[in-house]
Amino acid sequence: MTALVVTGTGTGVGKTVVTAAIGALAHDRHHAVAVVKPAQTGVGPGELGDVDLVRDLTGITDVHELARYPDPLAPATAARRSGHRAVDLDELAARIGTLADSRDLVLVEGAGGLLVRYDAGGATLADLARVLRAPVLVVTAAGLGALNDTALTLEALAHRGLDLAGVVVGSWPAEPDLACRCNLIDLESLAARPLAGVLPAGAGLLARLEFLAVARASLQPALGGTFRAQEFRARYET
């Protein structure tokens, strides 16, 4: 089974756009790709969710939102408030396993960060990654505060024996400040490896073909792109 779990250092760091970028590159290589959102929160009935954005950006139609709760809260809390059933970890892992049996790649995008709770028992995205034996890609912000958030996420991964697939900056500003530029070096130091990619701010607003080109330039070869961390970092040496 080829599954990749995409998490973030928090909410709003660009997980969905990064998930779409990975999916777009695999889809362009004619791989069978499925995208799974275990729980969508903060979106009401009939409104567009994260998997809809992925579909629009990539053309991938094999997308699966497994639960939806209207309140913009952690999945466990949102489920409790809505009165609806929370996501069950074992059922979720089984569904992803079934998808993976006939797909080349299954992308699993979490809600919020790695340790956000999905049910009253405290199951997290980290637990799902462990059950799936899937590597975890960490999406982080570019600027001030990113280092601590990233360090905490990486420490949580290591403590649980989970494999790190890489660290990607989800939204790089057009005019990066000093913190952003310095973080390029420090994020790599935390991860003990080059950055796996840097997506430009606004990438999620692009048309499909433009998005594919940006995805290719913004993700490392292991994720299907041409991004070279050293070359990118050299542009912003401080």
Curated annotation (Swiss-Prot):
- Top EC class per UniProt? ligase
Tell me where it resides: Cytoplasm
UniProt main location, coarse: cytoplasm
Name the cofactor(s) required for activity, per the record. Mg(2+)
Any one Pfam family here would be: AAA_26
In which pathway is this protein known to take part? Answer: Cofactor biosynthesis; biotin biosynthesis; biotin from 7,8-diaminononanoate: step 1/2
Location of the active site: K37
Keyword annotations of the record: ATP-binding, Biotin biosynthesis, Cytoplasm, Ligase, Magnesium, Metal-binding, Nucleotide-binding
Query: Where, by residue number, does ATP bind?
Result: 12-17, 50, 109-112, 170-171, 200-202
Its GO biological process terms? biotin biosynthetic process
Show the catalytic activity: (7R,8S)-7,8-diammoniononanoate + CO2 + ATP = (4R,5S)-dethiobiotin + ADP + phosphate + 3 H(+)
Where along the chain is Mg(2+) bound? T16, D50, E109
Q: Which GO terms describe its molecular function?
A: ATP binding; dethiobiotin synthase activity; magnesium ion binding
Recorded hits in InterPro entries, A to Z, give: DTB_synth_BioD (IPR004472), P-loop_NTPase (IPR027417)
Could you confirm whether the keyword Translocase appears in this record? Answer: no
**E.C. code:** 6.3.3.3
Residues the entry annotates as binding substrate: T41
Q: Which family would the database say this protein is a member of?
A: Belongs to the dethiobiotin synthetase family.
Quaternary structure (record): Homodimer.
Cross-referenced NCBIfam families: bioD
The protein's role, per its UniProt record: Catalyzes a mechanistically unusual reaction, the ATP-dependent insertion of CO2 between the N7 and N8 nitrogen atoms of 7,8-diaminopelargonic acid (DAPA, also called 7,8-diammoniononanoate) to form a ureido ring.
What is the protein name given in its UniProt record? ATP-dependent dethiobiotin synthetase BioD
